[in-house]
Amino acid sequence: VGSEMCIRDSAKAVEQVVSVLRDLPGAQVSVSRTPDASGDQVWVGTAETTPGIDGLVASLGGSKAATLPADGYVIASGRRSGHNVIALQGKDARGTFYAVQTLRQLVRHDKVASVTVRDWPLMPIRGGIEGFYGIPWSHQARLDQFTFYGRHKMNTYIYTPKDDLLLRAKWRTLYSGDDLARMKELVEGANANHVDFTFALSPGNDICYSSDADFKATIAKFDQLRSLGVRSFYIALDDIEPKFHCDADRQKYPNNGDGKWIADAQADYLNRLETEYVKKNGLPPLQTVPTNYSGSGEDPYKAEFGTRLDKDIRVQWTGEGVFSPSITESSVARAAQSYHTKHLYIWDNFPVNDGRRNRLFLNPLTNRDPNLYKHIDGITSNPMIEPYASMPALANYGDYTWNPTTYDAKASMSAVLDELAGGDKATRAALRVFADLNQSWPYRTPDTHAPALTAAIDAFWAVRDKGSVDSSLKDRLAAIVRLPEALAGMRQQGFFQDTRPWINAASQWARAGQHFVTMLDAIDAGDGAKATNEYLAAQKQVDLAKRPTVDDQGSDGVLHKAVIVPSVGDGVFDAFAKKASAQFAAFIGARPASAKAYSGTASSSMGQWEANSPSRMVDGNLSTLYWTNVSPEKGSYVQVDLGSVKPIGQVAVHQADDDTATGDMFYHAALEYSVDGSTWTAAGNFDSAPLIKHTFEAPVQARYVRVRATDANPGAQWVKIREFEVTPPVGVYSTNVKAAEGSSVALAFDGDVSTAFRAATPVKAGDFVSFVPAKGVTPRQAIVVGTARGEIQVRSGQTWTTIGTISDGAPFHAFAVPAGTNVEEVRLMLAAGSPAPVIREMTVVDRELKPVPTPTPTFTAAPTSGSSTGDDHGRPGYPTPTSTPSHGPRPALPSTGV
């Protein structure tokens, strides 16, 4: 394009062409309604608004746009009278606007490609429906959505946020004041970007369908919105109880138990709106979503609703389920037949995350049949609570609904990520790295989990098993660590702000991964001190990543700050941490001292989803689960009855889909136990904890154990309980040290280095912690992981031998056991006056770890200095306990450690 342009037509299309062309170096742009022979020209408009454009298109080798479907356009370019000329001709104003959007794509390296384009959509309805629960989009976010919709040739936005009381609870009330002013600005913003602002009213919770007053209230609401510029209207009848709210409806539509009664009432109300308001005012056809909005099979409600409904009314449908892993041509054809409509279109519940508010879904739209356009009017996407993070999926819908026969999910996603990132190559690469961490969509089978990260981790384990080195994981972890800085300058700042909690959590997980990798190298070198330091550093990062940092809003409309833990990495980070931690535990000989869970009868105050009954909480199978069909309210509970009063040492309640990631679960819970089911004793409170686990300092007696909600769940999330385990006490360890609240000596022998026995007070003379090694072990070293001071001793017969002293507060110590010693017990005699100890694990191993202190052994046949005579549990040399020690039968343990 040369130095001067002549642009013909009006408003938004011209404004955007000017914007595109002024970005070209040296360009001087003027706008005129007549051609200027002195410069290059860009003609913009329809045949009606721009006389002569038909002839220009023909002279440039194109075909005029008049024969195209609505929203279609033609682009033709070439030379005329010695000047470069481009024609952007639309079938209509919207088509002209879309021609400008394609022009943006044709500008490369400061030039406009010479092309001829003839383009039109295969689906007339293309866009989104703001129909989720949770924090509503901001006013600015909605305005930015309209700009994004326009650029991606999406023409529909359905306004139905669940938080707008004037759509639901107060649907008869008109907008006023600031609400009315904001609504006017939204409508104007949508219209400016050629987006149909569809106003969706949801009166179904209290409407009297046959009431003339309620009909007039509907008309009054529609009239107010029409005065603002709205021309598209919608009645939402989803998520309501199928019941009447007035005697007039009950008398006019008798309930015969077949579903037809409610269908008749709804259809008559909708038909009256279509006839007396929509058609009367020359508006586009009314739209609706019925109460039964999923499944393609026939039923009395669908048949009656569709048969009775005006044939022009558009009917929305979500697919075979509320969430549809795939939508096939045959399924849509059956649904259209079941609803008796030729105007079915899809409410697609992707990438909506109001049921999984800890997640982002940045995977591309897939598994929508390319031939759906033959049977439906279009698709609207139900996006995420995060408006800007929804843009990748929305762009996919724009591409798919425009031409599903050529839709390329991978290419579409790549293009929109680049658009959001901006022109910087490093930022684009970083955004792809982040998107890879959010690929799992749980309704899809088979699912995909962070594929690039997974490949790097798989390669790491594969070469490590062979004793080789692969750098791909280290490189990817380094890239993830840098994400907060790498994405801070991306073009679409709204996306960065939306996703920041997940970006930060990803960086923390990656730092943990780096420490785990270094830890594994230290394990290979037999360096216990370094391995322990790296493990603890990794665990610190994991703890940071698991902090709640995402805000939420419940049905009460109250915003709650930082109550949701962001889940990122599709579970791949968690799995890597779990495997690496297991290798560290094996390295130091940590094995859980465990007991088999009691059998019991499970019950719940909540209902169940499908066949997922409470009994599955106690079937001993972590792959099955109890799944509620409601969100817990304050006081809701799940419970296990042991049949009789029994001693309890530990309770573990495995929630959600994994012990390490939040999901459907109790977010605010109290663990309680009772002898009689009436009087309850609190064991602890747990917030945002997928694994509710409590080990009692001393065994308690109880018949009933329950988890009770102390508050309602954020986001109305349901609850999944995979297993509710109540186990007896285990007696391979002992102490006379009082544990801090919420802690237990058992945590020093549970095989989990992330937990710890924490003493309640500084050490007194005679305080100790001890354990009996597993039978068959030939200990070569005694290991203490934690911060404590004192002497490590081993017992053989009646003689205690001090094999080392801990005095430096370091988190790892390994002490050589004198050759030939028959170790029957190991104890840590804590140094009087030292700080309260924190002991993560005490173990023995049958190999040598380094560094190994080798002090001269000392022998003690009599009780340890400062302790009483006599012995605890019949063992020599023990002080009198100051608290009840754990005791009981000692099960045999694996030979690798405790």
Regions found by a protein language model. Give the residues of each.
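Disordered, acidic Ser/Thr/Pro-rich linker "stalks" and the adjacent N-terminal cap
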Residues: A586-K646, H654-M665, G677, N685-S688, ...
